[in-house]
């Protein structure tokens, strides 16, 4: 993943997300975001819209189904992902280049809206770390997580801050012998990072 361009785009959905399935059954949702910069003109005392950036985004698997169910045309969204360049020839034989976003995270902007978030069931994030982020079971790293101790992201359902029960704030537990490290360390259930998707 080194050298990839990760960007965050805030804008409005141009169309409803389009959900499709690959022949192997993996879900993919495509949608377009229009991001328009605004500047304040002091002479006219008005906000002026700049030139809009239209970006095609794709998101995969369970997140694709969540996007298709949750988002619709006109909603303001925040999208983070890896910018990709793709070249192709059109019908007239002219070589074209497009930029697309492989989405890692997407959500509704709450600047001028409200939302009630419902966690989907059966969605493990095994093997993914980060601060307080936890994998399923043993594994999931965190800052300073590792075989000797430190803090380890809790992956047990009791530590899930989205669960309906009263979970501890921050979702962190004192570390133990099992589990794997945060930034590239890692023994145990896949706490390190890999170029392979976690599915």
Curated annotation (Swiss-Prot):
Post-translational modifications: Phosphorylated on tyrosine residue(s) when expressed in E.coli.
Alphabetized InterPro entries for the sequence: NA-bd_OB-fold, Primosome_PriB/ssb, ssDNA-bd
Manganese found in the keyword field: no
Gene Ontology CC, one term: nucleoid
Stretches with biased composition (Low complexity): 157-166
One of the protein's GO biological processes: DNA replication
Keywords from the named record: Cytoplasm, DNA-binding, Phosphoprotein
Stored PANTHER family: SINGLE-STRANDED DNA-BINDING PROTEIN
HAMAP family documented for this protein: SSB (MF_00984)
Domain notes: The N-terminal 120 residues form an OB-fold.
Name of the featured protein: Single-stranded DNA-binding protein 2
Protein source organism: Streptomyces coelicolor (strain ATCC BAA-471 / A3(2) / M145)
Gene that produces this protein: ssb2
């Amino acid at each position: 993943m080194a050298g990839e361009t990760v960007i965050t785009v805030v804008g409005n959905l141009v169309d409803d997300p389009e959900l499709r399935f690959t022949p192997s059954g993996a879900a993919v949702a495509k949608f377009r975001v229009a991001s328009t910069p605004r500047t304040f003109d002091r002479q006219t005392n008005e906000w002026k819209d700049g030139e809009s950036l239209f970006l095609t985004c794709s998101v995969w698997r369970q997140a694709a189904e969540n996007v298709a169910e949750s988002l619709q045309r006109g909603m303001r969204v925040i999208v983070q992902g890896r910018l990709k360049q793709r070249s192709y020839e059109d019908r007239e034989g002219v070589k074209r280049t497009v930029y697309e976003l492989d989405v890692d995270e997407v959500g509704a902007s709450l600047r001028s809206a409200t939302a009630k978030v419902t966690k989907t069931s059966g969605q493990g994030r095994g093997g993914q770390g980060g601060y307080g982020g936890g994998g399923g079971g043993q594994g999931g790293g965190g800052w300073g997580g590792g075989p000797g101790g430190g803090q380890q992201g809790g992956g047990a359902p009791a530590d899930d801050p989205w669960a309906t029960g009263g979970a501890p704030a921050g979702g962190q537990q004192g570390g133990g012998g099992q589990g794997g490290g945060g930034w590239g360390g890692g023994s145990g259930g896949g706490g390190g990072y890999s170029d392979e998707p976690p599915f």
